[in-house]
Amino acid sequence: MSQKVANRSIVFYNSQSPPSVITEELDLGNCFSPSELVVKIHAAALNPVDFLLQGFAYSWLVGKGPKGFSRDYSGEVVKVGANVKDFKVGDKVSGLFQHLYGKQGTLCDYLILDPSKQPAISKISPVGHPEYDDYVINASWALVFGTAYQALHNYGQNLGPDSKVLVIGASTSVSNALIQIAKNRMKIGTVVGICSKKSFEYNKKLGYDYLAAYDDGSTVENVKQIMKNNMGNEKFDLIFDSVGNSEFFECINDVLKDKCQNSHYVSVTGDKKLNYSNPRIRDSLPGWESIRRIGPFRKYNYKLLLLKPEATFAKIGSEMIAQKQFVPAVDSVYAFEDYSKAFERLKSNKAKGKVVIQISQ
């Protein structure tokens, strides 16, 4: 029996094309395989990486067809294949849909996925947020939470009450998730954040033990003063960079423990702050500092984190939200028809939390 519906998607075609809406007919009766399910999307969050990928979307490299935006989503399962075991029609779910220049993104009415290939999906629990509904909150966290979780867990470190972590870019959405995981779940003893002076009060409430300003004197010296005055000059077990920074490399031995102690410097962007609105390939290339990270020249443990979609972080994130241990940060919510305003908000670099587009209510 035909169950045809209209499926709207926000897409781009290449690096020069503006975002646009396409509408295609989708037959819910036969659009999925036995191993797939169909999610009716209620909300999806924007991520800066989408603009970066579009900036590099040269037609000769990625083809001329439509390419979907976004990865975070929340919604309701409306169809389930015969071989899908863990989900049923009516389940409210959220997750991360990983793709690279695929036609399907999450800014659409219906998302078709195979949970065995897209494992970062979990059932959502009631949130009870005073301002936003459950779908908005649950659309806002998978990518940033997963990134933060893997930064803290994927490199063989056993971080806990005696550990010390430095967060470069304390006000980003990824760092917002990281501080909540670090303090509320892992009970990490000392977390120092770097942010603007005006963000001190906000970040202190999240759980940072000490904050260093990047807009008041030398960032490096401000951190060293915290180490001297509050940490007994002990060095960090982990330096996490969520913005793109190179200030600490010249004095890495002064701030990061020796590599033999399994200390790590983990970055999600590289050594430079990327211009997501106008990305350039040369800004993404490794610099001379990379020589100190490889082979016999390696002076410290460095990782450029590329998020892997995993069921583990999706399950833990959902549990922490239900237990009030993690509150995703939402900056603003826009209707589907106002997607261009949502894009501009994210590009403004003024968003404090995720920018979410509500697909259906």
Curated annotation (Swiss-Prot):
User: Where does this protein reside within or beyond the cell?
Assistant: Lipid droplet; Mitochondrion
SUPFAM superfamilies per UniProt: GroES-like, NAD(P)-binding Rossmann-fold domains
* UniProt keyword terms in alphabetical order: Lipid droplet, Mitochondrion
| Any Pfam family matching the protein | ADH_zinc_N_2
Top-rank taxon, per record? Eukaryota
Q: Indicate where this protein is primarily found.
A: other
Which Gene Ontology terms cover its molecular function?
Answer: oxidoreductase activity
Q: What Gene Ontology terms describe where this protein resides (cellular component)?
A: lipid droplet; mitochondrion
List membrane-spanning regions: none
Q: Which family does it belong to?
A: Belongs to the YIM1 family.
Protein name as annotated: Protein YIM1-2
